[in-house]
Amino acid sequence: IIQLIETAYNTQIKGDENMNYKTLEERQTNVAEVVGTISKLPTVTHEIEGERFLDFEVEVERLSKAKDIIPVTISERSMGTKEFKLGDRVLLFGQYRSHNKNVDDRNKLILHFFAKDIEKTDEQDKNDVKLTGFICKPPVYRTTPFNREICDILLAVNRPNNHRSDYIPCILWGRNARFIADQSVGTKIETKGRIQSRIYTKKLEN
């Protein structure tokens, strides 16, 4: 899930004519950067067209001290000869992607950070993602038990030079939630936020 902190119309669809956004083809539509601590070691999990891929997890701490656990996938070629151990601090560059996985005869949307580069680092924790895509389901607006405004959207993000899209669930809060709630399916937006893994407990009435 992406928690968004900024949202803007892309002028290819609608919006202020003075906003001067670049077109989808002129910019990357999916950019993510994370600094965190390895909490699960890389292991080879699958192979595609002869190239092996490794999965691992990185823990990223927020200013509030809450922690997000981010699943990461990286190719063996991108990993190279680098070796990592639990507790290593790493800097990751890549994209936030999705794929469907069959679980109990049902398709489940799996989200992961696809790393194109990894390095050891002493930098502070970082969790940034920027997406440009299309709203592909009607936004769902609601209020939390603490009366905070929230809106869920599913964003289709096209991969450049690839006939595939990543479907990314996003959460917006406050004025951003109000802004996006009335937008229609097919609206293109530019978003900026963070990857969020914290599990929420839903409060039910007796």
Functional labels for PLM-detected ranges:
Residues 4-206:
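Single-stranded nucleic acid-binding surfaces, predominantly the OB-fold ssDNA-binding core
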